[in-house]
Amino acid sequence: VVAGSVGRRSTSFSERPKEALRRGALMKMLQQNALTLPLFISKEDEKPPPLCGAVPAEPNYVAKVGDMVAALARGPDDDENWILAEVLHYNHSSCKYDVDDIDEEQKERHTLSRRRVVPLPLLRANPTTDPGALFPKGALVMALYPQTTCFYRALVHEPPSGPQEDYLVLFEDSSYPEGYSPPLAVAQRYVICCKETRKK
């Protein structure tokens, strides 16, 4: 094995027609990833563990290499966005993560402090047995906008009604008169607590 080649992805963008295909494949992979997230089945008097549905991680939790996270990263235009990223490394002495933008077109690597990284749920909550492990109707959250790799602020319109169901969320969107999008479906995997980002 050539040193440094492990886990590297192809960065050849000469095949332009393949970009749409790659993007379609990425969206399919993200959807698949959400569907295969294990469902937590609680026993009597058992509480859902951290990172089950809306249950936050422990304060000292460190995401593992390969985990998907939401990361507040600065883009090429100097704007900051919460992006879907993969953890490459965590430096315990500096308390910083190295993460890779999951979007191949951006393919940016970022070094970020812990407060700029939010781990995604590792388990789905079962609405039947653990409704308290879900964000309630009206909760302010961050959710992955459908067909993108960015998280945006949204209000929960309806929590999942069954283990296989998605949230229905209303994204903040000034192009609509009410300031919110129509209800859009987002999987539990990609709905997290809202981190306040300072307005410019």
What are these language model-derived features?
Residues 1-200:
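Eukaryotic chromatin- and chromosome-associated nuclear factors
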